[in-house]
């Protein structure tokens, strides 16, 4: 049993964990301490992205928190519909001054300066996500990348500095399949080609990690179940990007909001200090929430009396180039903040209760629903069927391996291997064993990732660089000092400066995607042993493609 698996066994919650008695007692105790302390002092929390799905859940929790913080929120002036809804919901708090609204863009220095002035904490939830990031990639650049840079610069210049909680994304890990279903912070970050959302979030996250902010924490959000999920996924062809065998770990929006509230409450009442600040975490979910893409569709269609097989065909959805993992270290945040209260089953039960009319669809022929809803969405520009019809070879290659591979997908479910049914690429598999965290297969990043920070030496830095096909340029390193930047060199000879924490503990390694919308992992993986472990799970070693986007954000595709 490796140290990796010993750590999992030591810290993992039980398989059907929701919220233990001890966790509840812990949460109550922390809230009580926070309330007592907040009778003597007041904090201000600046929050971005409050009109989004996670943002709404965070606002619900913070406005009900024992902290009773002053909340200063940033809202886009052009987002009139959602801004009006927000003002109506929190009218009383706005009148009392408990909630203050700053209208502006996250990339606008003046608006951001006004937002964070005098704040004790900043919670950055703002993000342009798919499908909007696919339709308007320039907005993703402005918010996810430039917005993060603007926010970081403002906090760096503030005196005193507020503490920053930055929400990142599981999308940084890129595509995973049955060979490497599990990931942990520190795994390589191979953002999927053409996914401007993940590329801009990658750059935004690194900006935080390399910043001069004294207290920051980066939380990589997993797949999130929220009240608008069904409606949002029936607007364009994005649902067809979800691989049926993709590992998805579903946290609910409610629990995400609880997490943020508990972080602030504990930091006020009983600061976690070194256990939390200046670290990256995965936002994990209860074990029963780890399922596949197909099972997710199945759960949703069960509301109308059907199944995934009733409405989809194997060839409708991508077979690679998505994002999703099960978190081997998702329990770490739970141990600190006891936020996991909802299962996926609970979420679907709540959706059914709130939308009882969904059950009326049970009397409608399934073939008719498929034609009117699913087949209609396949005509959308964001759907594979559209790419095929219009000859978008770049996207067909990125998501399927090529046009021939797309055409060769089976028409019948009997001929398509579903992991959840015990069928893998090369034959039968034990799905329950794959879902068991004790069987997680760790990525070899070149050094012993289970070492304590204090035991990291220059040999570990050199080994990590070598595993990436590069080298450590700096000749000195104080053992355990993961936050003093050092120089590294990539396989292409590019020299870059980064903190050892960013590379060894957070998985960053410089490539062209960090500065432009170019994805060339086919080439990089041939010399990068860390990338190769993931990339070749779903890509051929003979593939020689470069995926990119032009200055006007049009997709490009060419051979090396």
Annotate each PLM feature.
Residues 128, 149-196, 217:
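Conserved Rossmann-fold NAD(P)-dependent oxidoreductase catalytic core, especially the SDR/UDP-sugar
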Residues 265-336, 340-350, 355-366, 371-434:
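Mid/C-terminal beta-alpha module of Rossmann-like enzyme folds, strongest
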Residues 415-560:
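Functional cation/ligand-contacting sites centered on basic and imidazole/sulfhydryl donors
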Residues 92-146:
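NAD(P)H-binding glycine-rich loop region in Rossmannoid oxidoreductase-like domains
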Residues 43-65:
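N-terminal Rossmann NAD(P)H-binding glycine-rich loop of SDR-like oxidoreductase domains
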Residues 191-217:
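Active-site Tyr-X1-5-Lys
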Residues 209-262, 297-300:
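NAD(P)-dependent short-chain dehydrogenase/reductase
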Residues 107, 139-150, 195, 199-200, ...:
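Glycine-rich NAD(P)-binding loop of the Rossmann-fold in SDR/ketoreductase-type enzymes
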């Amino acid at each position: 049993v490796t140290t990796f698996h010993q750590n999992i066994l030591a810290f993992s919650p039980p398989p059907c964990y929701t919220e233990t008695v001890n966790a509840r007692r812990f949460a109550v105790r922390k809230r009580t301490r926070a309330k007592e302390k907040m009778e003597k002092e007041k904090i201000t929390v600046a929050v971005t992205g409050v009109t989004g799905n996670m943002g709404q859940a965070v606002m619900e929790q913070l406005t009900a928190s024992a902290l009773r913080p002053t909340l200063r929120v940033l809202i886009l002036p052009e987002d009139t519909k959602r801004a009006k809804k927000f003002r109506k919901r929190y009218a009383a708090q706005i009148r009392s001054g408990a909630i203050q609204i700053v209208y502006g863009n996250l990339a606008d220095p003046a608006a951001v300066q006004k937002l964070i002035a005098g704040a004790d904490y900043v919670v950055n939830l703002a993000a342009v996500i798919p499908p909007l990031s696919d339709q308007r990639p320039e907005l993703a650049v402005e918010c996810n990348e430039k917005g993060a840079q603007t926010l970081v610069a403002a906090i760096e210049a503030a005196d005193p500095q507020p503490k920053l909680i930055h929400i990142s994304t599981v999308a940084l890990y890129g595509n995973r399949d049955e060979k490497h279903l599990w990931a942990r912070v520190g795994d390589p970050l191979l953002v999927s080609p053409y996914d401007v959302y993940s590329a801009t979030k990658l750059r935004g996250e690194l900006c935080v990690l390399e910043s001069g902010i004294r207290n920051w924490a980066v939380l990589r959000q997993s797949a999130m179940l929220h009240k608008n999920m069904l409606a949002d996924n029936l607007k364009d062809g994005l649902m067809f990007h979800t691989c049926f065998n993709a590992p998805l770990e579903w946290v609910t929006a409610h629990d995400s909001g609880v997490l943020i509230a508990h972080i602030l409450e504990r930091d006020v009442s009983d600061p976690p200090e070194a256990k939390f600040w200046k670290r990256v975490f995965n936002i994990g979910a209860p074990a029963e929430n780890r399922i596949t893409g197909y099972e997710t569709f199945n759960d949703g269609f069960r509301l109308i009396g059907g199944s995934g097989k009733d409405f989809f065909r194997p060839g409708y959805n991508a077979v690679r180039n998505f994002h999703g993992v099960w978190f081997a270290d998702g329990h770490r945040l739970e141990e600190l903040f006891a936020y996991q209260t909802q299962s996926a089953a609970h979420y679907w039960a709540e959706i059914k209760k709130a939308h009882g009319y969904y059950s009326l669809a049970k009397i409608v022929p399934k073939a008719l629903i498929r034609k009117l809803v699913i087949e209609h969405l396949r005509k959308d520009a964001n759907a594979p069927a559209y790419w095929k019809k219009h000859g978008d070879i770049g996207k067909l290659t990125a998501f399927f391996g090529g046009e021939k591979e797309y055409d060769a997908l089976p028409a019948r479910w009997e001929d398509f291997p579903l992991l959840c049914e015990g069928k893998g690429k090369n034959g039968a598999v034990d799905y329950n064993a794959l879902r068991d965290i004790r069987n997680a297969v760790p990525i070899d990043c070149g050094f012993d990732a289970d070492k304590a920070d204090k035991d990291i030496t220059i040999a570990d830095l050199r080994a990590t660089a070598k595993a990436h096909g590069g080298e450590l340029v700096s000749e000195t390193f104080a053992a355990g000092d993961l936050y003093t930047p050092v120089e590294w060199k990539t396989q292409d000879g590019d020299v870059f400066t980064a903190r050892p924490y960013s590379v060894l503990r957070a998985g960053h390694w410089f490539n062209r995607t960090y500065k432009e919308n170019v994805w060339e992992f086919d080439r990089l993986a041939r010399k990068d042993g860390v990338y190769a472990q993931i990339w070749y799970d779903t890509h051929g070693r003979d593939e020689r493609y470069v995926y990119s986007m032009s200055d006007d954000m049009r997709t490009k595709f060419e051979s090396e």
